[in-house]
Amino acid sequence: LNQNYLNAVLQGMKSVTSDTGGTAYVRFKDFNISVGGKTGSAEAPNNQVHAWFVGFAPFENPEIAIVVMVENGGHGNYTAEVVRDIMGEYFGMNTQDIEENMGAMIYTETLQ
């Protein structure tokens, strides 16, 4: 892989969380560790949209990478909040118990 291409991708992922126009900027603007990330959505049947976010931190020397996907979750910046909270716990930044801020709902459907 050409290093120039890799650098362009990495800078794009940094701008997602650090530039005011970034799709996850609102979620990471006050986060004390630099994060690279990418929001996304995937169309599903019946006009449903799955949301996802992939992030890694610290940007300069990553220790952790996380992907969160929520079925029928809409757009990816909501999943960025989940990644931010997990990273906050990992780096010892959150003061509240993570269970108070996050929940998981298991949804299953049988296709006929």
Give, region by region, the residue ranges found by the protein language model:
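Active-site beta-strand/loop architecture of penicillin-binding DD-peptidases
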Residues: N4-D97
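Acidic/histidine-enriched alpha-helical segments
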Residues: F28, D97-Q112
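Conserved catalytic neighborhood of penicillin-recognizing serine enzymes
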Residues: L1
